[in-house]
Amino acid sequence: LGAIGIFEETLTIEELRADVRLRTLRSLGQLYAAEENWAKSIENYQAWRQLSPVEDVVVFKGLSYAFYQQEQYAEALPFWLDYMNLSLVEGEELGRDDYAYLNGIYFVLEDFENALDLTKTMIVKFNDSTDWLNLNAVYASLDMEERRVQALNLAYLNGVIDDEARYLNLGQSLAGMDIPLTGSEIIEEGLRESIIERNEDNLQISAQ
């Protein structure tokens, strides 16, 4: 018998103490997750919740992951929110990865309003370049063009834009918003720093 088999056998003991049964169920939830048997992981975590008088961050997190791995994102969302809220209640500090996972679910569910609020929170808390660029993407998904350009401009001003496509996009977008000088300056900087390829098309854009 492997570890899973031993724990499953343990659960068949009728006189098993409640605390031992709870530990066994939680362990099975984790072991089945390690085996990528997501349905059995969920089954044991849910059985734990039915018996336990309190909730647990490991169980909430495990349930969310298991549903996520099965592409059941709507089911994964509330368990992750519960995990984050309970962690904060217990005085635990949440990392950027915790917020990024939640934002990933919002994006998959196309819940861009919540993604926008969360992305702003992440920028304030972590000031990570990925979040600055995500802000631009969220505004684009919401068809808020002026805000999208403003977000891209803020990312540029914070020094997190280093690819040709975004340099050109920002420069042309600002020019289209009747801010041609700034747009031209950004494209010229991209050419000077070799971020934008010095070809005929890009030189024509710079000259406009």
Go through each PLM region and give its residues:
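Alpha-solenoid helical repeat scaffolds
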Residues: L1-Q208
